[in-house]
């Protein structure tokens, strides 16, 4: 897990806290096989989305970018005014991460080799 997190977040001294939060999120999603609500993730890492949105969403954003987690937004109810309320769900997708890694690495190396000639 350390190599994957190092690949995603790098080795910047300030990335340590983000890596630890991302690791907690990944372990939680790996145990829960199906889609997990954002509220459950919030309880697991013990950081409020309203109080500290950047601390909460930075690890999720990076994990989504690298396709280690997938997200879907579903309508879960209606307000009194008749508007839909939505909940975001996340799921651990290691197979999509490997495909993303293979495709981007191949494209990057191919581009550099063409420039080298």
Positions of PLM-derived features:
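Alpha-helical recognition domains of nuclear gene-regulatory proteins
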Residues: 28, 44, 59-62
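Short helix-to-turn junction characteristic of helix-turn-helix DNA-binding domains
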Residues: 29-33
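Short amphipathic alpha-helical interaction segments
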Residues: 49-66, 71
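Short, Lys/Arg-rich nucleic-acid/phosphate-binding segment
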Residues: 72-87
